[in-house]
Structure formats: structure tokens, C-alpha cells
Amino acid sequence: MLGNHISVAELTNVSKHGFWILLGDEELHLPFEHFPWFKAATIEQISAFEWPSEGRLYWPMLDIDLSVDSIRHPERFPLVSRHGRHS
């Protein structure tokens, strides 16, 4: 089928600080500091992700959908919960 996205996407490493994924020839780091909802996830849950389109990733076991740009530039996407912080 024309237009299908078929590049390789895989989990390459997990540490206590975050994890790395390979999208085609680009490796991206997702630090738990910026993506805290992955911190309690199992390796199985983190590694079971889909790359349905060039700009989107989806973790069905966790029901997490992320823009690839939010991983490349987390400072542009304030995703970290501010619960408990005082102004």
C-alpha cells in the first residue's frame, strides 16, 4: 500500500533515568524527568510501542500517545505535572 510508514522502531536501552528508542536512524532519549508517566512502567510496557506515523508514537499498554517533536524538544511541550507546587 502506498504511503504506509514502515521504518524500524525499537527500544534500545532503559536506565533509572529514562529510556532510548530508535526511530529509523534516529535515537531519541525519553528522560523520566520530562516523561514521568513512564517511570512506573515495566520494560514490557515501554517496549510495546507503535510508530503509526512519522510524527506520532503510541504505547497501547499504557494508553500514551506522544508527538515525536515533544520528545525531540520537551521544553516546547510542558508535559510535566506541576501537582503539589506552590505559586
Predicted regions located by residue number:
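Motif-centric detector for short Cys/His coordination patterns
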Residues: M1-S87
